Amino acid sequence: MPLEKLKDLHLDEQNMQPETREVNGILMSKMMSENWDKIWNFQAKPDDLLIATYAKAGTTWTQEIVDMIQNDGDVQKCQRANTYDRHPFIEWTLPPPLNSGLDLANKMPSPRTLKTHLPVQMLPPSFWKENSKIIYVARNAKDCLVSYYYFSRMNKMLPDPGTLGEYIETFKAGKVLWGSWYDHVKGWWDVKDKHRILYLFYEDMKEDPKREIKKIVKFLEKDISEEVLNKIIHHTSFDVMKQNPMANYTTLPSSIMDHSISPFMRKGMPGDWKNYFTVAQSEDFDEDYRKKMAGSTITFRTEI
């Protein structure tokens, strides 16, 4: 059953808030943890493309860019279904009769484009064995945190984040779904030169979408005209995507995602964290950040 049919199920909102469990030290929903053996044993294919990110790091944006490239800028083809059905979210597990990510992925003909938020050590090993291409997108911690906080408030399938102050501490401790942001971005960074991985930064994509989309085109071994490239830049701009029901999750009932609390696509601007962190919170966060990121060669911009 597609996600849009959720409104027909008359789901109890109180029951949508998930129980959580840890799998190998990483927090997941109880349903994901119960399905973990199947997720771990998922069979990737050599022609799969995996879009991997930490939550709220530009995943849907990258999915739309990739879909437009694969379909040579054909907007109609990219409107064929919502993002969830076009690019199965491999670990996301939903109660029957809804389609979980694995169900959708296993039914999908090749070549498949898939999505994950899994940290690198939790990625099903078949992706490495089959040498599937992977695009990883990283976003600076403070903006990621604020976006994840508001997403957790509006998405009834995620744990209640509490206040922003409480959530900052939860985020720093890595006690959110998919675990520590710090370990996630560093883990994928450390393997980027050992596999077919294109590692991108959200801030770079915002600063110069044309340059970054060209990197994706090259990685996918595609050849597109300047006209198609400009069409992709326009169609995947924040303002256009915010109005696209096949990408902005507005087709879901408010019992699942309540856009009156916060839209799925909120602002998307690097540096927006400054509107939410107090000076003290920012200084405390920065001190903790330096300790957790010590020794890593990865660098982030917190504004552009």
UniProtKB/Swiss-Prot annotation:
One of its GO terms (molecular function) is 3'-phosphoadenosine 5'-phosphosulfate binding. One of its GO terms (cellular component) is cytoplasm. InterPro entries: P-loop_NTPase (IPR027417), Sulfotransferase_dom (IPR000863). Substrate binds at residues 115-117. It comes from the Eukaryota. The keyword Transferase applies. Its EC number is 2.8.2.-. The keyword Isomerase does not apply. The active site is at residue 117. Its main location: cytoplasm. One of its GO terms (biological process) is sulfur compound metabolic process. 3'-phosphoadenylyl sulfate binds at residues 56-61, 139, 147, 202, 236-241, 264-268. Inhibited by 2,6-dichloro-4-nitrophenol but not by triethylamine or tetra-n-butyl-ammonium chloride. Gene3D superfamilies: P-loop containing nucleotide triphosphate hydrolases. It is found in: Cytoplasm. Expressed only in olfactory tissue. Detected in sustentacular cells in the dorso-medial portion of the nasal cavity. Disulfide bonds: none annotated. Belongs to the sulfotransferase 1 family. Sulfotransferase that utilizes 3'-phospho-5'-adenylyl sulfate (PAPS) as sulfonate donor to catalyze the sulfate conjugation of drugs, xenobiotic compounds, hormones, and neurotransmitters. May be involved in the activation of carcinogenic hydroxylamines. Shows activity towards p-nitrophenol and N-hydroxy-2-acetylamino-fluorene (N-OH-2AAF). Also shows activity towards cinnamyl alcohol at pH 6.4 but not at pH 5.5, and towards a number of phenolic odorants including eugenol, guaiacol and 2-naphthol. This is Sulfotransferase 1C1. It comes from Mus musculus (Mouse). The gene is Sult1c1.
